[in-house]
Amino acid sequence: MDEIIFRQYRLGDESRIVDLFIIGAPHKRTTGFWEWINKCGPFGQSIVEVGELDGKIVATYAVMPVQVQFKKELVKAGFGIQLFIHNEHRNINNTILIADRVYKRCKKEGFNFIYGFPNDYAFPLHSKVMGWEHIADFRCMELYTQKIKSDSEYDRDIKIERVEIFNEEIDNLWQQTSIADPAKNAVIRNSSFLNWKFFNNPLEHYIANVAKINGEVVGYMVLKLFRKENVFCGHLVDFLSRKQNEKLIFQSLLHRAFDFFGWAKVDVIFAWCFPSNTYFEMIYSIGFRPTGFNTHFALKPIKNNDLADLTKYDNWFITMADSDAF
């Protein structure tokens, strides 16, 4: 049998990469989605390696560049996506070969680290073979709609509007949040990131609401509808609010979300929200519980820097928007 040739992605590989995903992955993927996530990201194009055999792509690994707030500074990092190898060639040796090629390029490009959410199959390889640090396992927060305790406490002077684009006004919000001060480790939420993630995605449909006080944008929340077998689900994909009046702003956004999910006849609502997250107490008080699906959160050091603050679970602000799965 001929050996797999590992090399950098070249223009024209897209269709054969998507062939590979469709053969072995449950999620719908298209060349449009591949180009959106790897070529159109707000922080630059992904580093992509492939393995080719007999004219077919049998392995691929992509790392998307992101800007992460770390100790009040913006650092260059990567989000690990789309590590996939054809079943007939899936082994530790091929995984290491393609991963090492990606990591060397990440180092050359000045990445400080890579983060990701490896699935149950990939996680042991990441943690035991590929040099990733396990930050935490966490469970999705979930709330069955018939168990909502109350969402009546909200300020009617806070106006909630649905938007079809995030304008530059949203860029001012980040520095006014409790995520920015005191600084959490977090991918920057600016208009470029939010519009790319929620309005340019060629596969997904999102509902974005902003909160306004006296005409000024003071918060936002992004929702998604999702059907899994016979269960109709709602996702709180992303949310952020100004520190001043934080609770009232968030509650107003939640009220609008519940109103929409009620109209849609959603059965259960999901969200990612760590206990250290400023919003955790608010969603816990109305019935959300960490009883949903489990997720592995891990990090791959690229530079020899101090990882102490990066590998502490409580130091991160993470929502579903930080994953490519939602």
What are these regions (language model features)?
Residues 1-12, 147-168:
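Conserved N-terminal entry element of GNAT/NAT acetyltransferase domains
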Residues 4-83, 120-121, 166-242:
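A conserved beta-strand-loop-helix scaffold within acyl/acetyltransferase catalytic domains
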Residues 15, 19-22, 100, 104, ...:
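A broad, structural surface signal
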Residues 65, 112-156, 207, 213, ...:
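Active-site/acyl-donor-binding loops of N-acyltransferases
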Residues 82-85, 90-104, 246-259:
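Conserved acetyl-CoA-binding loop-helix of GNAT-fold acetyltransferases
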Residues 88-90, 98-121, 125-127:
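Membrane-interface helix-loop-helix junctions at boundaries between adjacent transmembrane segments
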